Amino acid sequence: MDVKYKRTKPYQTAKLPIRQPRIMTWLLYVVSKLMMPWGIQYKIEKFNMEGVKPPYFLLSNHMYFIDFQLSAMATYPHRVNNVATIDGYYRRPWLMELLGCICKRKFTTDLHLIRSIRHVLKKNGDVLCMYPEARYSPVGTTAILPDALGKMIKMSKVPVVVLLHHGNYLYTPFWNYRKPRKVPLYTTMTQVLTAEEVEQKSVEEINQIVKDALTYDEYQWQVEQNIRITEPFRAEGLHKVLYQCPSCKTEHEMASEGAQIFCKALGDG
């Protein structure tokens, strides 16, 4: 993506997010439902959510844009403020603001973010959604979660809910997201910590509970669900993550086409 910096207006990350208008909550739900891919089965199940109402922390794994759609459907009718990276504000900052998103720069300490989170949870009493992996999963497994997450949860003193998606990565893998596959999608929404447990447990214990709840392996799930991916293009792009030849150990000489991945250094193409 070409960015014309002279035309780009600096975004004020210090300002507090707005409370998501009720009409936007409804519209987001309807649009998300209508935009779900035709012919793809999906299911959202809730566990240990009886009586759980905002405010609460919502933590989700992150595999592709469809995560946001499933999240909007799972949390409806409650208002949600999503923590979003600043690159998402490049084209339509007004829309991100209207949705109540909280702007965040990646891999930096941001005191304004803490202030915004407290504003959402304490003043507005809404849902605060974060994707702690901070990126799309490149290989379909859990990324390293920041230790600061437990401190933030401890400080908030609200329940913690985990939204765990399965199938989203297999449907549109990071390395070939332009060609979706016919894979069923399954999302679970689970309360993993009550407000009382957050107060009682240590930061280390909270981090471990969250880590366990957000652990996933898309390929293991595929095997367990007996899912076959038969699209003729299923290997295209795989060389972007499997960049080292397992035979000659040469790096960055892998290539892929159709349902095959091969090493150019060995002349396997």
Predicted segment positions?
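Short, structured interface segments
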Residues: 206-220
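A generic structural signal for well-ordered alpha-helical segments enriched in polar/charged residues
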Residues: 33, 119, 212-216
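Hydrophobic/aromatic-lined pockets within catalytic cores
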Residues: 157, 215, 253
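Cys/His-rich short segments
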Residues: 230-269
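Soluble, non-transmembrane catalytic domains of enzymes that act on hydrophobic metabolites at membranes
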Residues: 1-5
